[in-house]
């Protein structure tokens, strides 16, 4: 059984039939018909499986597997959108999905690093952010500031911080936030949140799919979707 999280920029897979299942990643632009899976989620997942599960459902199941607290907020930041789930007393309390304020967020952050030849591992957190409503529209603010004399690195750092604060507010401004997605590997983004952040990595949705597959195989397994 192969599970797939099909994102806009990257797709993640887990082959449960392998002797030692390990997740792996490939660029979504290289996907072919050979990449069909048993259960899929993600923006383009319906094209690669007969069984598709909504991303919010999978995110919730992944959070249940990886987070021990009964009360938590889990935010997933992807290439083209952001989504969150909020649990209270071990039960789903709220959720949200936004492709407007999160439009092309992860993609834009990655694109800027390439364009300006920047390393987010060494960029310091700026003293103030840009007011950013979405990734695409925020780029014009960067170019305006660079033309006005702001160093490239500082302008991009303010943009990244603005994106992080916007995502934080979308998730309800929690005091502690669990983070999912490729931006977990971006220290500038993680450190720009005005709260405690616990990065869970980019395979949370695969964990959710694995829990769903386990439940399918053993409906009596209460731990699968507890």
Features from the language model and the residues they span:
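Glycine-rich phosphate-binding/hydrolytic loop that grips phosphoryl groups
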Residues: 61-64, 106-109, 197-226
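N-terminal glycine/serine-rich phosphate-binding loop of ATP-dependent small-molecule kinases
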Residues: 1-61, 191
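Short glycine-aspartate micro-motif
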Residues: 1-5, 70-76, 178
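Glycine-rich phosphate-binding loops at beta-strand->alpha-helix junctions
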Residues: 43-44, 169-193, 200
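Adenine-nucleotide phosphate-binding core of ATP-dependent small-molecule kinases
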Residues: 134-176, 198
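Glycine-rich phosphate-binding loop plus the immediately following alpha-helix
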Residues: 91-134, 201, 207-212
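Conserved phosphate-binding catalytic cores of ATP/NTP-utilizing and phosphoryl-transfer enzymes
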Residues: 49-90, 168, 207-217
